[in-house]
Amino acid sequence: MHSILAVDDSASMRKMVSFTLVGAGFKVVEAVDGQDAYEKAQAQHFDLVLTDQNMPRMDGLGLTRKLREHPKFKTTPILILTTESSDQMKQAGRQAGATGWLVKPFDPHRLIEVINKVIR
């Protein structure tokens, strides 16, 4: 069973994402922001990180950069799931090391499709 770290400062969004992922057969650990996610990622292995962009303490791009600094996370897929859809933000995501960029509101089937594509 693949494990996913789901990061979002919105409790309702975390629950919606977790419900979708667990329903598709994934193990999910939730984090409330980038700092919380970074600490959890240091403590255990995840097959994929799915993160919001705009969060307190550490945003999604900051988390992506920080994870990519460590060899342990060089190849871990990181998807950013956010309301931000500008080409400049997507480019910033690629430069930070994000594997992909998905826009909220999200289609649950599309989310699962993208995750399956990048981790299997």
Listing of model-derived features with the role each one plays in the protein:
Residues D52, T82:
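Active-site residues of response regulator receiver
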Residues Q44-L50:
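Active-site beta3 strand of CheY-like receiver
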Residues M55:
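Receiver (REC) domain active-site loop signature in two-component systems and cognate sites
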Residues G25-V32, K40:
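Short hydrophobic/Thr-rich beta-strand motif most characteristic of the beta2 strand and flanking loop
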